[in-house]
């Protein structure tokens, strides 16, 4: 008896949702670095001193720096590296935003029976909802830090209280994150006005990241939301500009735009355009089996080429992970990346350029690597993907508010004198913080994100032009 294959009920882009969930946890891991340093410093000091100290005077930091090569192991480094994760987030956004457009263009080239007005209405609806949803949720994420700041629970001078001096950028270990938060004002009215001004920063998307007023200070991670909104506008304009072009011409123009964006120092726009290129490639690959099946009247048979394609994509995925692992700090001390320096002698390539290239390779290949795709489509990854945006928005405030004291409290009981006790204390504290972030993210999604999404949908329906009967 021949059994019919069980159809896969998951959407074709389900792995994208799971990948987003895993990336949100990677960023959570990355932001633990300064928290661990302060927690260890508090429990390891015999007496409190506010005299200027170098962060390298902390034994844990000095030990990590002396063994820096262990923290530059390719692929393993991705577990706690924020920059590659952010680059992949941007590429995914460009990919998802372009999928519908690519499908429309392909369908239009095959048939003229297309309701153009309906298509443009769908595009407009997507832009309206996405922009408003991101903006409202970003502003909502600043309310809790605002309350913690005003009530005195959170103190932006915690690093100065440890007596740690500010070092050059590469040696700060993200300890300057506390300084990015605003000062506490005397009255609630002044603090509220300051919050409103920071909320308004969400819409100033054309400012540069180096400008002091770019990032909303009540939640510094929101700089990526502003960059996302700016790149979304650039991508939408490009969608309209290339509406009447052939696929080959589109790919050439997009590649040129991406290279130009990298040359002028842009991070997010080249990644959005690269996401569009990958959407074009993936869609063309999906159409090839269908075209072959129609031509022969038979379903396409699997051949050895499928296995070779999987092997090739696995190699590309591994290469992408390797490139994305390029160290941000002291890359010359990472012997496993000497190949990069040999390939570009005398040329200084910013680490984020390598991270961007790695992110593009990962997004291009992951879909066709069965093991990687199954991981992203697993129930755990899908759950994290459902809450990924909430995790990203709320984790930073929780980590820097509770993290240092929690690490020091746990280490004071488990001990911190040897590697075993240090690891046990880290595992306990990490588990507590991780569960707290997941619980808070679930609450945020249930009571803030979902109502905001419904409100935006309702607002668009009430504002849209209705068809006449």
UniProtKB/Swiss-Prot annotation:
Its EC number is 2.3.1.-. The chain crosses the membrane at residues 21-41, 70-90, 134-154, 253-273, 346-366, 391-411, 424-444. PANTHER family: ACETYLTRANSFERASE (PTHR23028), PUTATIVE (AFU_ORTHOLOGUE AFUA_4G08520)-RELATED (PTHR23028:SF134). It is found in: Membrane. Acyltransferase; part of the gene cluster that mediates the biosynthesis of squalestatin S1 (SQS1, also known as zaragozic acid A), a heavily oxidized fungal polyketide that offers potent cholesterol lowering activity by targeting squalene synthase (SS). SQS1 is composed of a 2,8-dioxobicyclic[3.2.1]octane-3,4,5-tricarboxyclic acid core that is connected to two lipophilic polyketide arms. GO terms for molecular function: acyltransferase activity, transferring groups other than amino-acyl groups. Keywords: Acyltransferase, Membrane, Transferase, Transmembrane, Transmembrane helix. GO terms for cellular component: membrane. The keyword Membrane applies. This is Acyltransferase clz18. The keyword S-adenosyl-L-methionine does not apply. Pathway: Secondary metabolite biosynthesis. It is an enzyme of class 2 (transferase). It comes from the Eukaryota. It is a multi-pass membrane protein. Belongs to the acyltransferase 3 family. InterPro entries: Acyl_transf_3_dom (IPR002656), Acyltransferase_3 (IPR050879).
């Amino acid at each position: 008896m021949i059994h019919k294959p069980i159809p896969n009920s998951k959407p074709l882009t389900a792995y994208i949702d799971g990948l987003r969930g895993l990336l949100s946890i990677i960023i959570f891991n990355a932001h633990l670095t300064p928290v661990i340093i302060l927690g260890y410093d508090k429990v390891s000091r015999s007496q409190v001193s506010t005299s200027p100290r170098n962060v390298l005077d902390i034994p844990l930091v000095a030990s990590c720096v002396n063994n820096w090569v262990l923290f530059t192991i390719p692929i393993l480094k991705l577990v706690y590296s924020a920059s590659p994760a952010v680059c992949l987030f941007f590429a995914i956004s460009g990919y998802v935003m372009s999928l519908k457009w690519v499908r429309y263009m392909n369908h239009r080239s095959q048939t003229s029976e297309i309701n153009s007005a309906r298509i443009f209405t769908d595009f407009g609806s997507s832009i309206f909802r996405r922009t408003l949803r991101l903006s409202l949720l970003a502003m909502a994420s600043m309310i809790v830090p605002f309350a913690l700041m005003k009530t005195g629970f959170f103190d932006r001078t915690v690093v100065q209280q440890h007596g740690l001096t500010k070092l050059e950028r590469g040696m700060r270990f993200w300890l300057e994150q506390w300084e990015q938060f605003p000062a506490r004002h005397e009255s609630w009215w002044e603090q509220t006005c300051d919050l409103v001004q920071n909320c308004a920063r969400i819409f100033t998307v054309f400012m540069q990241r180096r400008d002091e007023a770019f990032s909303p200070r009540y939640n510094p991670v929101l700089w990526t939301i502003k960059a996302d909104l700016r790149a979304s506008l650039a991508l939408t304009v490009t969608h309209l500009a290339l509406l009447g072009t052939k696929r080959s011409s589109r790919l050439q123009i997009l590649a040129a735009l991406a290279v130009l964006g990298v040359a002028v120092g842009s991070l997010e726009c080249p990644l959005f355009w690269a996401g569009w290129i990958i959407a074009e490639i993936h869609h063309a690959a999906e159409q090839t089996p269908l075209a072959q099946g129609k031509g022969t009247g038979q379903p396409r048979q699997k051949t050895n080429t499928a296995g070779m394609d999987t092997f090739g994509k696995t190699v590309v995925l591994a290469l992408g992970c390797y490139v994305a692992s390029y160290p941000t700090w002291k890359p010359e001390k990472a012997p496993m990346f000497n190949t990069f320096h040999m390939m570009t002698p005398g040329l200084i390539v910013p680490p984020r350029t390598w991270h961007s290239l790695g992110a593009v390779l990962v997004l291009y290949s992951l879909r066709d690597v069965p093991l990687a795709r199954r991981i992203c489509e697993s129930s755990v990854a899908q759950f994290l993907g459902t809450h990924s945006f909430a995790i990203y928005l709320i984790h930073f405030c929780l980590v820097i508010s509770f993290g240092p004291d929690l690490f020091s409290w746990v280490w004071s009981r488990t001990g911190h004198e040897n590697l075993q006790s240090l690891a046990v204390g880290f595992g306990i504290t990490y588990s507590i913080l991780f569960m707290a972030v997941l619980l808070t993210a679930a609450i945020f999604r249930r009571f803030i994100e979902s109502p905001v999404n419904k409100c935006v949908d309702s607002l668009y329906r009430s504002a849209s032009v209705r068809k006449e009967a």
